[in-house]
Amino acid sequence: MLARMDYNVPLSPEGAVTDPIRVDSTLPTLDHLREAGARIILVSHLGRPKGSPEPRYSLAPVARLLAQRLDADVPLLTDPPGSDALTERVEAMEDGDVVLLENIRFLPGETENDPDLGEALGRLGEVFLGDAFGAAHRAHASNVGAARAIRDRGGPAVAGLLMERELRFLREAVRDPARPFVAVLGGAKISGKIDVIEALLPQVDRLIVGGAMANTFFRALGLSTGASLVEEDRVAMAGELLERAGEKLLLPVDCVVATTLDAAADSRTVSRDGVGEGERIGDIGATSQELFSREVRGARTCLWNGPMGVFELAPFAEGTFAVARALAEATDAGAISVVGGGDSAAAAVAADVAERLTHISTGGGASLELLAGASLPGVDVLDQLGDEGGNE
């Protein structure tokens, strides 16, 4: 079985996996397959190598972590798909064996969905399993190309347990949510989330906007944002969204500002119309934290994507952590909470509430695409997907 995973994990300078969530999230799939006697060839990328080997992007640390988690040998195979050496190694596998191919982006043609590479990968397995939700919004050789190659030979292309879980929670969050349905959007730029806002506005009972993307909305309201990041070419769009959303869209009423955004910043809290000329907005203020937290605690379904500030820096972390704690409290009270991957997932871990939330997505970009109503090539190519059916 050829299994496309998303092991694009952060590594320390010493080469250790610093956040194992993407590896650990695939363990239920791997345990299930091994118990069934499958011979599993794992495929993944890590980082953005340019079609040739770069040691800093090797999947060797992932192979070591998988071996620890599975309590089994997980060799890293460096021979390329289509080579006699790799074919012979795969043919020698026994039931329950797991191997990991070296970073698929070390090969030219992966990101271009090269048909020859897809065919070479497809010849390694009789079944394709897609469990890389984090890469599902890309049409690459290792997901779309390999799946099609196996399907063309009459083999199935199926979703893994992680893929099914991701799609179930993200689709249900929008399609038939328990109400009140509250969405919290943050992060740096409105441009990457306009389609998500457009898709969510008719569905949500309340849309909360924080983080640096709120600055562009402030500018649309005619407020000074000092030296803060603002997408000038999106101010008019922000104004249109504010007009359409009315009272449904909630912005911060106060901000934590400083002249520099660093760990030693001398910060102060001001109302949103009190940002000084040389000041930068780094977080939402205490009043906004309570306002947002009250909305989140009252939700029955809550979707969160994007931090409220520069949470990696202590002077600007409390807004994000306040939202994370409120989300955990809502979940404890029976709400469904879905965190849309990326920085918000890291923030949930940093706030020590990750275990209390319903679902933390492993795919930042893919989750946004799905919430915006876009098709995901890595999902569309699968012909067995729980009760959703195939898309081809």
Regions found by a protein language model. Give the residues of each.
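Active-site loop-to-helix "anion-binding N-cap" substructures in soluble metabolic enzymes
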Residues: 1-392
